[in-house]
């Protein structure tokens, strides 16, 4: 009976061969896989879109918040000339994120409220400069549309 047990258990040499063969198998599979390179890596559609959007975003966009008074430089082309026209007002809304991020800027021009929606990463937006920080407790300031005169002012924030 002891001889049967001895015959069924592998000898030291056989066990070393088994260990070496089991070690060799994963290495062989690792070597056959292609190296990770940008040209050969296959991305999912969602990852590909995210990568494209990231490449199209502007690098230096200031951190703006709802309630801030900003000056947006808008590129205007007249004929073959191009100039930058400033548009200053209060941000009353921010929407979306990433490449499609928009801000709605409101100002009073000749007694009439004018709102413009700017895509932050658009080539038509030359610059965004924060003139003063606003202290508000709402994500959207649509209530400013109903206010007139001094009631449309936003308190200034000094900590940002």
Curated annotation (Swiss-Prot):
Gene3D superfamilies membership: 2.30.30.790
Entry GO CC: cytosolic large ribosomal subunit
Protein source organism: Prochlorococcus marinus (strain SARG / CCMP1375 / SS120)
Compositionally biased intervals (Basic and acidic residues): 1-15, 28-39
Coiled coil: none
Keyword list, A-Z: Ribonucleoprotein, Ribosomal protein
PANTHER family: LARGE RIBOSOMAL SUBUNIT PROTEIN BL19M (PTHR15680:SF9), RIBOSOMAL PROTEIN L19 (PTHR15680)
Annotated protein name in UniProt: Large ribosomal subunit protein bL19
């Amino acid at each position: 009976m002891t001889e049967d047990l001895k015959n069924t258990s592998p000898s030291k040499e056989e066990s070393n061969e088994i260990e070496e063969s089991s070690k060799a198998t994963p290495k062989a599979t690792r070597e056959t896989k292609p190296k990770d390179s940008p040209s050969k890596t296959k991305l999912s559609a969602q990852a590909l879109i995210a990568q494209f959007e990231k490449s199209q975003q502007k690098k230096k966009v200031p951190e703006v918040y709802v309630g801030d008074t900003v000056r947006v430089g808008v590129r205007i082309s007249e004929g073959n000339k191009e100039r930058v026209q400033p548009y200053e007002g209060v941000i009353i809304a921010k929407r979306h994120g990433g490449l499609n991020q928009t801000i709605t800027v409101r100002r009073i021009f000749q007694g009439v409220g004018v709102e413009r929606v700017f895509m932050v990463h658009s080539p038509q937006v030359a610059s965004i400069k924060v003139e003063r920080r606003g202290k508000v407790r709402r994500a959207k300031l649509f209530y400013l549309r109903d206010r007139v005169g001094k009631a449309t002012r936003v308190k200034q924030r000094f900590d940002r």
